[in-house]
């Protein structure tokens, strides 16, 4: 029997909270050393029996872990901790904070603000061209459907810093982009384009100070809008 799995409390707990508890128990297998990167997890039936949870709750938890790169589910092959998860502890931390959107937003701000200043020194012309394309895609989008182009804009900047230490962190964080994106109560395409243009101009001029300033203004705007929307629910 795996330690730390059998004590899940299910009384008067809603499904979302219960799924988070399941995530915590599964991650515990890794952090406690009972299982290691690349190891196979117990089957769904075994986990349901051990944790006393329904299949929908378990699958919601497993889906979150898979999205964040903590596990891989293979058809008819079972579920495994990813081979490189030991090199990406940030993915595990995000898995444990999936229901704490303000914390995820602030983590994203802290990371991206540092990366954009480095990007101002390292970004190349090809990456600048790709950035411009995302801005054009957003400007030309219909019905404000520009989530992927928005995500790509931030991904290009983050990876242009060319720092392998933080690359895994930003990739994990950007995976949560869709969750953050879904919390925006309404979109303002023209405002997004304006913010992105200012960031682009600062990067093109190799100005880390203005790049930092405009990225902060952009992310603060997004954060405040999301938090306001959450308060109104």
From Swiss-Prot:
Q: Where in the chain is the DNA-binding region found?
A: 44-63
Question: Which PANTHER family has this protein been placed in?
Answer: GNTR-FAMILY TRANSCRIPTIONAL REGULATOR, TRANSCRIPTIONAL REGULATOR, GNTR FAMILY
Organism this protein belongs to: Bacillus subtilis (strain 168)
From the Swiss-Prot or TrEMBL record, what is one GO molecular function term? Answer: DNA-binding transcription factor activity
InterPro entries per the UniProt record, alphabetical: GntR_C, TF_FadR/GntR_C, Tscrpt_reg_HTH_GntR, WH-like_DNA-bd_sf, WH_DNA-bd_sf
What UniProt keywords are attached to this protein's entry? DNA-binding, Transcription, Transcription regulation
List the SMART domains.
Answer: FCD (SM00895), HTH_GNTR (SM00345)
Q: Cross-referenced Gene3D superfamilies, in alphabetical order?
A: GntR ligand-binding domain-like, Winged helix-like DNA-binding domain superfamily/Winged helix DNA-binding domain
What gene is behind this protein? ycbG
Give the HTH gntR-type domain ranges. Answer: 16-84
Task: Provide the protein name.
Answer: Uncharacterized HTH-type transcriptional regulator YcbG
Superkingdom of the source species: Bacteria
